[in-house]
């Protein structure tokens, strides 16, 4: 779930990187980031792994130090989605449904001062967007000015995260909600690991704008997310009308049927 796409830093300044710089030790293994303008930065950290149309699973432990220098994969974007075309006309970002990764910005790994954690959920509804679709989504400035640990999350969207294939087998019973399950998996990872990045797992705020605000509202009503965050900020979001429409299972299964028919896929 750790991709290979890159994005240049938005702010000028010297970058410090090396074998002994910005090493965080997590239960899964060591992670190496870099320091930019005195903020430790980690990109593309895998918080889960998943087979296509299947629920996320915990990542396996790794023996070597994992490099977290490059932004990870983002969920595939629809070429016909005008929002996606607008957002991704700039820096190239590698697209894959193997996109369960997050980015972290922190003032320090350990200085005897656990910091509040702010988890950014990107806009674009549940259809498009990514954790780093805009230079403004780089968390360095917020981490510095607010003295907080900032996390941004990529997760499955559109048909990769919300196509209801439940009519085609028990193994697909959760396929309509995989995007939300990814978000819960990210919050679980944060609860377990964020202390290793200087964050306070008992002081986590989720926040998002537009469709990201809708995700915040959705998580507030998701039982499996209970206890994984403690505060919420909704910026111009609504559950319906922000890329999300609540439909009956019969309707969502029909959408899946039409999708497979249009793709001429055997079931």
Locations of the language-model features?
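Non-catalytic accessory segments of hydrolases
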Residues: 7-177
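Glycine-rich nucleophile elbow surrounding the catalytic serine of serine-hydrolase chemistry
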Residues: 127, 208-218
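Mature extracellular catalytic domain of secreted serine hydrolases
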Residues: 67-90, 170, 174-175, 181-185, ...
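Gly/Ser-rich "nucleophile elbow"/oxyanion-hole loop immediately N-terminal to the catalytic nucleophile
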Residues: 109-114, 165-181, 185-207
């Amino acid at each position: 779930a750790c991709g290979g796409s890159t994005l240049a830093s938005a702010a000028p300044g010297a970058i410090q990187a090396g074998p002994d710089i910005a090493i965080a030790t997590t239960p899964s293994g060591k992670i190496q980031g870099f320091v930019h303008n005195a903020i430790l930065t980690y990109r593309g950290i895998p918080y889960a792994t998943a087979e296509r149309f299947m629920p996320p699973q915990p990542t396996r432990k790794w023996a070597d130090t994992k490099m977290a220098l490059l932004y990870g994969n983002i969920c595939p974007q629809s070429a016909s989605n005008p929002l996606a075309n607008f957002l991704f006309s700039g820096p190239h970002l590698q697209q894959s449904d193997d996109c369960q990764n997050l980015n972290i910005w922190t003032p320090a790994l350990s200085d005897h001062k656990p910091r509040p954690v702010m988890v950014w959920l990107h806009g674009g509804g549940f259809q498009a967007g990514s954790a780093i679709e805009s230079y403004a989504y780089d968390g360095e400035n917020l981490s510095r000015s607010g003295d907080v640990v900032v996390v941004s999350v990529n997760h499955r969207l559109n048909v990769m995260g919300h196509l209801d294939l439940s009519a085609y087998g028990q193994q697909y019973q959760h396929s309509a909600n995989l995007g939300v399950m990814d978000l819960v998996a990210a919050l679980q990872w944060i609860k377990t690991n964020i202390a290793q990045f200087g964050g306070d797992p008992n002081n986590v705020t989720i926040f998002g704008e537009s469709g990201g605000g809708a995700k915040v509202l959705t998580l507030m009503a998701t039982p499996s997310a209970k206890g994984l965050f403690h505060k919420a900020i909704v910026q111009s979001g609504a559950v319906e009308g922000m890329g999300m429409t609540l439909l009956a299972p019969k309707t969502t299964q029909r959408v899946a049927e039409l999708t497979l028919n249009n793709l001429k896929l055997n079931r």
